[in-house]
Amino acid sequence: MNMKYDLVIVGGGPAGLAAAVEAKKNGIDNILVIERAKELGGILQQCIHNGFGLHEFKEELTGPEYAQRFMDQLFELNIEYKLDTMVLGISENKIVQAINSVDGYMIIEAKSIILTMGCRERTRGAIAIPGDRPAGIFTAGAAQRYINIEGYMVGKRVVILGSGDIGLIMARRLTLEGAKVLAVAELMPFSGGLMRNIVQCLHDYNIPLYLSHTVVDIIGKDRVEKVIIAKVDENKKAIPGTEIEYECDTLLLSVGLIPENDISRATGIKIDPRTNGPIVNELMETSIPGIFASGNVVHVHDLVDFVSIESRKAGKSAAKYIKGEVTDGEYIEVQIGNGIGYTVPQKFRMENIEKNLELSMRVRQIFKNVKIVVKSNDFVIHSVKKNHMAPGEMEKITLSKTVLGKIDANKIVVEVVEEDK
């Protein structure tokens, strides 16, 4: 079956919904959202805890409530969507191959495409934990789905490896459901989650967090029987004699998220090795003109509100591209300096910036009383004081047109400096 659309959006989660609604509001009528699951909303449907929407709606919502607000807008604007539909591939000339049980094999021609596929969890295999291979080992997201959607309890005595936000939230969720969470072990000397989640999910329930610890052995024949954790040195190697043994039936893994870019790579889109997502410009456009990306497929966000904000930018940019309103120009590269892990966007053109440019970034380690500075030719054009920064919390800085006007090179450098410098 052959089809033609102005805009095709791959992924019907929070990023795809926000992008679709914004593109429609900017004059694009012929839009198709493709979602591989049986319902729209993405991961939010299983995030039944509150804490969503504080930035976007100025009120606290659960995940399904947040998703429903955008779904209602999608329905109101009569934006077409296909569920249970798998995208098989995308070509450089913006032809999408997809398949489902109703329409069969589809070839969809698009004037523009937005990639909003989100991210996936790292598994046990990805981090090579030693030990037996019994039942009772889950990623935190899989456990969340079992409990919140399928209605299955995953275990009674639980150890969690990794202190990402999903792991922290599941520590609380399991406790509320009657399980005993014995410990959360984190390989790094700092938590990978938001401080508010550490307080609300661990401290409030007296769940111990062991920093610089990892799982060194899993023991169990049919089901997990014991998990052994140990302290690690600065080279992340276990220190003999520091082992702690837990009798438990379940191990949850919250060991990082990876942007879902198999399709992006196959299409030939350039990927940033630091984010594992596409390299994007000021319009959230990838290395292939007319193909945009936003949300967790680009870089992992802390809050869904920020995913929505970024995706609205992608939706508006795709509308501009379709209408021929994008101006080409010389790219200015955003390079990372001391302490910065990555920035998004990685490059920009002055011609397409309306008011200001927002840079999202993560730092490599914990910093206190420092400044984020932006330099052009070693000259500081912008600086922001920061009392506390951690890799688990995304930082944002806004560069105004006035600041951008001071750039006199084809690159800027973003770095962390001590306060007195």
Language model features with spans:
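FAD-binding core/adjacent interface of flavoenzyme oxidoreductases
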Residues: 1-10, 68-157, 233-241, 252, ...
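Exposed aromatic-hydrophobic patches
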Residues: 360, 392-403
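Beta1-alpha1 glycine-rich phosphate/pyrophosphate-binding loop at the start
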Residues: 5-69, 73, 145, 154-200
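Mid-to-C-terminal Rossmann-like scaffold of FAD/NAD(P)H-dependent oxidoreductases
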Residues: 305-306, 313, 317-384
